[in-house]
Amino acid sequence: MRSVVVGHMGDARYRALSLWHDTVPDDLTPRAGLPGTRGEHIADADVAIVGGGLTGLWTAYYLTELDPALRIVVLEKEIAGFGASGRNGGWCSALFPASAAALERRHGRDAAVRMRRAMVDTVAEVGRVVAAEGIECDWAAGGTLTLARSAVQLAAARAEVALAAAYGVDELTLHALAGPGAAHPSVLRETPRKSGVSRETHSGETASRETRSGETAGAAGRAAGTAGTGGAPQALDAPRTLDAPRTLDAPRTLGAPRTSGAARTLGAPRTSGAARTLGARGALAVVHDPACARVHPAKLVRGLARVVERRGVTIHEQTEVLDWERGRVRTARGDVHAGAVVVALEGYGATLPRTHRRVLPLYSLMIATEPLPASVWDSIGIAHGETFADYRHLIVYGQRTADDRFAFGGRGARYHWGSTIRPAYDRSDRVFAHLKRALDDLFPQAAPYAVTHRWGGPLGVPRDWHAGVTFENGIATAGGYVGDGLSTTNLAGRTLADLITGAASDLTTLAWVGHRSPDWEPEPLRFLGANLGLAATGLADAEERMTHRPSLAAHLTAPLTGH
């Protein structure tokens, strides 16, 4: 049984963080922190992990698979799952912050294809562990739906599907929609002007599409070029019904589970099942990506924490890390000496001098409605297990929760001077109102239903929008997920475990291994650039609505966002 801080009022405080924390069945009273004082040598470990989110916990999990005898200590300032890992949009997707095209430009085509396969496999691997360990986290693998609601967005959808087909990994399919909110099928035959503009968006982790993790939504390799069908798998001459997800009694495994002794290979993508309709206002078509599962993120991260504790890992909460070096982690409650140190702080790394400019803490906010009746969900057409988004530039993402709410989020909150992170920044009445308007516009059926929860939090954005994992001189790092961390953290944990233990693995040769993003510029350049970029993203959507052409603003800013 874990020890807790007696008399601590943390349970109520932490339940107020999000819908997910409010509905997790755990006691959120913090685990005991390190028992010492600053500068005192308190503990020894083989591996000390800085950060009690999914990156740190997945790393601990796979380390215990490879070597159960390892002494592993996790150090967390608040509670396990306090940050983006527990607050995101609940998309366990195959999205990666850098698009497939960007990966190819930087690392070559073969490396880009291997990275895409690794991400698709990761969705199945998370599902395998959830089932094997009995983690009750509302897992349902229904895929994600990305709606095209204008001719420009339809061109983007076609291009994304064609690009995915060219890489041969992601099994995206494009469908016209039948339903009360769908546009007339003749619109699908309209051809917008050709353009060389390329657009790709990402889902996110605090609001996971969280970059589609739920903060964020989009698909890797999303691009809008010509309106021609070149490479698209289907002609859209008439409405088609959309494939519904399979009913899953347990997460479906795409390949064999990992073993500690043999080299691991990357598997194949998945497919989907039977027909039904989707109703959304003004929607022309939808792209279905099967490589995504709906999840309750706080249940996942809290459940994973219990699993690693059962395996002998020690978690110290209420333990603020001040700094680290090879062989030692310094905290406000004493020092831990360790053979290897894992730094897994994501956006919160911006609060420490050593990593202040490594990532930019970008806020993503969410709302959740009261539960909707089954009859309303029938008219909406979103099934359990499906996540959803559309092709706008200012990202939105959502899911139907296990208790029949809309959980819906997006970008729009400004960057704060000096990369500061404060509880007050988790909430913005302006952004919350924008999210409710966006949800009601997308699904008018949601309009009469009250919003019961509002929350947000920072995710970590590297300067080149390219996540990375490193292990050098006894210090391992992982992060820069830009909201795609709900799944990418699992790949990071597996990869770091292999790097730290020296296990034979295909994962340690993936393109993101050893990648180091450049630092962000100092202020005021960082403040000006981040907020001007945010404004340009919103203007890009307005530009496309007015001109019915791909946005020039989006084209000009695309290289700054990993596309």
Regions found by a protein language model. Give the residues of each.
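Dinucleotide-binding Rossmann-like beta1-alpha1 core, especially the glycine-rich loop
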Residues: 95-179, 226-229, 235-244, 250, ...
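Extreme N-terminal leader/targeting segments of oxidoreductases
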Residues: 1-47, 65-66, 70-71
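Helix-loop-beta segment of a Rossmann-like dinucleotide-binding subdomain
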Residues: 36, 136-146, 178-193, 270-303
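Helical element adjacent to the flavin cofactor pocket in flavoenzyme catalytic cores
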Residues: 162-165, 281-339
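Glycine-rich FAD pyrophosphate-binding loop
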Residues: 64-87
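Active-site substrate-recognition segment that forms the wall
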Residues: 133-140, 321-323, 335-375, 379-473, ...
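Short beta-strand to alpha-helix junction loop
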Residues: 110, 114-123, 148-156, 287-306, ...
